[in-house]
Amino acid sequence: MKSAKKLLSVLCLGIFILTFTACDMVEKTPEAKAKSTIAKVNGEKIQRKDLDESPSMQQVLSQIKTQYGEEFEKSEQGKEVIKEQKKQILENLITEKVLLQKGKELKVIPKDEELNKEADKKVNEIKAVYNNDEKKFEETLKSTGFTKETLKEYLRDQIVIEKVINEVTKDVKVEDKDAQKYYNENQSMFTEKPNTMNVSHILVKTEDEAKKVKKRLDAKEDFAKVAKEVSQDPGSKDKGGLLGDISYSDSNYDPTFMKAAIALKEGTISNPVHTQWGYHIIKVNSKKEYPVKKFDSVKEDIKKQLKQEKQQEAYTKKIEEWKKASKIKTYEKNLL
């Protein structure tokens, strides 16, 4: 099972790894179900087997079996969960089909010899994950529903998709001034060591409650005592509201909460801060802040990051445009 997961994670790693003739109701055989049409994209069919055999679907089924057991997918709840997952994966397969069609239109598909060479290189990279153990590699292929031939065909498609994406994003550029602006606005991200702060908070439901809490704290009542009395955060209430050390870049906290906390000076308490959880009174107990790296030492990293973001935006905009212009029809009744 671990080997299978390893291969699936390799195949599903890239940002753009996306992986039924309509049947009459009387067709109940596995073969007929596999060939049933689940979508048409500009006249080209996507069959149920394309979805069921995709790495994404295999990974979903593996996770479901690990989490809920072998029988879960046969239950009504399991079928509903799987159907929702299939709908998401089908959307990816439709995107993949549009990209492959555009590959022909844009004339970016390499000749077979070159395409096979690139696919073989990727196969060898996957084999390297298994220390080039051919037996283990073949066993894993079998357990994930691949043969050497179908794996290579899958990789050929992914190579074409990469080339389409490269064509769409080839003109994206980032200037030094863009990097400088980002650096100036986000200097806490470029310190010699990550900046951290030790934070406590009191969480209440309403703004009026928060104002009353702030008034008590302004009157010099003990923060921890008030937190234990009124805070509605079960994770920190009994600790006097203490959240502990938090990195300035920690994405586990609400962005509004983080912005307010970072803006506070050491030892100070905020006014009420509204987030999705309610109203917070935040106290920064201490801070550890480090010198900011020189712009020239981080410029290229910033430009690389900004370029990737712009490429993603350009790709997303283009694929939405292409899909909107395509004739797409789905047949959700054939998903199960």
Swiss-Prot record:
EC number in record: 5.2.1.8
Catalytic activity field: [protein]-peptidylproline (omega=180) = [protein]-peptidylproline (omega=0)
UniProt KW Signal keyword: yes
Keywords: Cell membrane, Isomerase, Lipoprotein, Membrane, Palmitate, Rotamase, Signal
Domain PpiC: 194-286
A GO molecular-function descriptor: peptidyl-prolyl cis-trans isomerase activity
InterPro entries for this protein: Foldase_PrsA, PPIase_dom_sf, PPIase_PpiC, PPIase_PpiC_CS, PrsA_foldase, Trigger_fact/SurA_dom_sf
Compartmental location: Cell membrane
GO CC annotations on file: plasma membrane
Record bears the keyword Signal: yes
N-palmitoyl cysteine: lipidated positions: 23
Chief location bin: membrane
Recorded topology in the membrane: Lipid-anchor
Signal peptide: 1-22
PROSITE patterns xref list: PPIC_PPIASE_1, PPIC_PPIASE_2, PROKAR_LIPOPROTEIN
Lipidated residues (S-diacylglycerol cysteine): 23
Alphabetical GO biological process terms: protein folding
Family per similarity comment: Belongs to the PrsA family.
NCBIfam families: PRK00059.1
Function: Plays a major role in protein secretion by helping the post-translocational extracellular folding of several secreted proteins.
Name used for this protein in its record: Foldase protein PrsA
Source species: Clostridium botulinum (strain Hall / ATCC 3502 / NCTC 13319 / Type A)
